[in-house]
Amino acid sequence: MKALKDFMRMKHEGEKISMLTAYDYPSAKQAEAAEIDMILVGDSLGMTVLGYESTVDVTLDDMKHHARAVRRGAKDTYVVVDMPFGTIGIDASTDTAFAIELYRDTHANAIKIEGAHAAPVIKKCHDIGIPVVAHLGLTPQSYGITGYQLQATSKEAAKQLIEDAKLVEKSGAIMLVLEAIPSDLAHVITESLTIPVIGIGAGVGTNGQVLVYHDVLNYGVEHKPKFVKRYGDFSIGVESIKNFHDEVKRQAFPTEEYTYKKQIMNEVDE
């Protein structure tokens, strides 16, 4: 399993870091088999696999359930798990208690926290030994305020984001995720920090990239953001299911090939 020192080395040597967002045992097993550097158990699971309207509906128990499944599927991969909405922003002590619970109960390698406002919690977690990945730019838990759109598009907002990035690093974040910001800004932030920066919709100038398993494979997702590239097409699964349905109706399945050959009723009748 890669450790933080490996990700720091990769940043300094210019080797890009791959991160995949996955939510369950089989996707985690596939990610590990593909030698992905890191897995993120994101609260985006709310919309992607639970059918919620937004990440706001995701609970701490949801995150625990899915993170445990990912950990079982990827025992030798660095796993990061999201702190869900409602667990950050209460007060530093309560927030930290939630962080301890999630970190302890999932056996993740790190937790991820959205927003620069969480800097005090990041520091508390750092002080007690919980690695924290910070998340700036488009922060889905705040979509009601920021919207799902490109962030930091004004000079003032860009300057603020640079300051926020420096703040979370100073507070003890081990890594930073930048989402949906101009690529030149992401590059400047990446170069200004000593910690690795992972981008999603932030251009090529970051230290690595993250995409969601379901987006990569076109698996059950309806919306395709600009920054998503499809590397496979699981949408053909609908046709496969339809074929199964049709064969059942036509009594074309199961054939002898898929039927156990042992006969038992003669013995029962004796």
Swiss-Prot record:
Residues that hold 3-methyl-2-oxobutanoate according to the record: 43-44, 82, 112
Annotated positions binding Mg(2+): 43, 82, 114
Keyword Nucleus in record: no
Recorded GO MF terms: 3-methyl-2-oxobutanoate hydroxymethyltransferase activity; magnesium ion binding
Active-site residues, Swiss-Prot/TrEMBL: 179
GO biological process: pantothenate biosynthetic process
Pfam families found in the cross-reference section: Pantoate_transf (PF02548)
Primary localization class, coarse: cytoplasm
EC number: 2.1.2.11
CDD domains: KPHMT-like
Subunit: Homodecamer; pentamer of dimers.
Main function: Catalyzes the reversible reaction in which hydroxymethyl group from 5,10-methylenetetrahydrofolate is transferred onto alpha-ketoisovalerate to form ketopantoate.
HAMAP family the UniProt entry points to: PanB
Protein name (database record): 3-methyl-2-oxobutanoate hydroxymethyltransferase
